């Protein structure tokens, strides 16, 4: 799966599982 953070897709392990990314509202897409 992927996350979208500020319009940027990141790998789950680097974004979804990252507390900073979660804090800014990253979402699975």
From Swiss-Prot:
Disulfide bond entries: 3-16, 10-21
UniProt keyword annotations, A-Z: Disulfide bond, Secreted
A single Gene Ontology CC term: extracellular region
Secretion signal span: none
Known tissue expression: Expressed by the venom gland.
Broad class of where this protein is predominantly found: secreted
Location(s) in or outside the cell: Secreted
Family: Belongs to the neurotoxin 33 family.
Protein name: U20-ctenitoxin-Co1a
Organism: Ctenus ornatus (Brazilian spider)
Classification of source organism: Eukaryota, Metazoa, Ecdysozoa, Arthropoda, Chelicerata
